[in-house]
């Protein structure tokens, strides 16, 4: 409406959610959930295959006051407030950490598309989906959780596993067995942030994720 075009300057439907409050709020629960969802979104983008696309200011929670098309807003709505870098230091550090993970693990930025096949005859495909059972992706249409295993064999790097739980309930993910001598370590999550030192998982067969959480594991 602020653009003065009767909402004709973009699609009518927006894939968005205010987390329980419209606009600015002081409710800690809403603010914490918004922060978690921003981190989840960055994990989805930066750990996906292909070239990640990020709008300037996303890394420090620039909201444009809910306006997703600020082409005509030469004002505070469309400008970037760089002072938010200090206020959103935690989110900014998380995004930088995710970028470092993407660059540090070849499975997240291969030169060729992963095929879901065992290209090196190592016994596992280069990428595979998992759920509560290993090697079995959730089949329900309403499912909001998925585990993705990346084999490092093709690129001679470490195996990785990313568990996505977008549900409002906790879920358990089965972990694929690693080659002899290797263990799963947590390297980051949208709940704990980027870990300075990888933590060995006590349970090497499964991992439980809290609601609306993404966790990244490395096999080493």
Show which residues each predicted segment covers.
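Alpha-amylase-like alpha-glycosidases and glucanotransferases acting on alpha-linked glucans and related
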Residues: 1-30
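Carbohydrate-interacting/catalytic domains
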Residues: 22-39, 44-220
């Amino acid at each position: 409406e602020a653009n003065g075009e009767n909402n004709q300057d973009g699609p009518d439907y927006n894939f968005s959610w205010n987390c329980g409050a419209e606009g600015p709020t002081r409710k800690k629960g809403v603010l914490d959930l918004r922060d978690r969802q921003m981190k989840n979104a960055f994990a989805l983008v930066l750990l996906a295959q292909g070239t990640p696309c990020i709008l300037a200011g996303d890394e420090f929670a620039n909201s444009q006051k809910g306006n997703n098309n600020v082409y005509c807003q030469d004002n505070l709505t469309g400008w970037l407030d760089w002072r938010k870098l200090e206020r959103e230091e935690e989110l900014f550090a998380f995004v930088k950490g995710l970028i470092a993970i993407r660059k540090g693990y070849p499975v997240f930025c291969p030169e060729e598309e992963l095929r879901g096949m065992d290209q090196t005859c190592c016994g596992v495909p280069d990428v595979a989906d998992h759920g509560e059972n290993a090697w079995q992706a959730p089949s329900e249409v309403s499912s909001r959780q998925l585990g993705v295993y990346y084999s490092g064999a093709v690129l001679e790097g470490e195996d990785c596993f990313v568990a996505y739980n977008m549900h409002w309930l906790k879920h358990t993910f089965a972990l694929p067995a690693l080659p002899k001598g290797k263990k799963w370590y947590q390297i980051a999550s949208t709940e704990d942030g980027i870990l300075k030192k990888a933590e060995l998982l006590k349970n090497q067969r499964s991992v439980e994720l809290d609601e609306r959480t993404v966790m990244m594991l490395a096999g080493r």
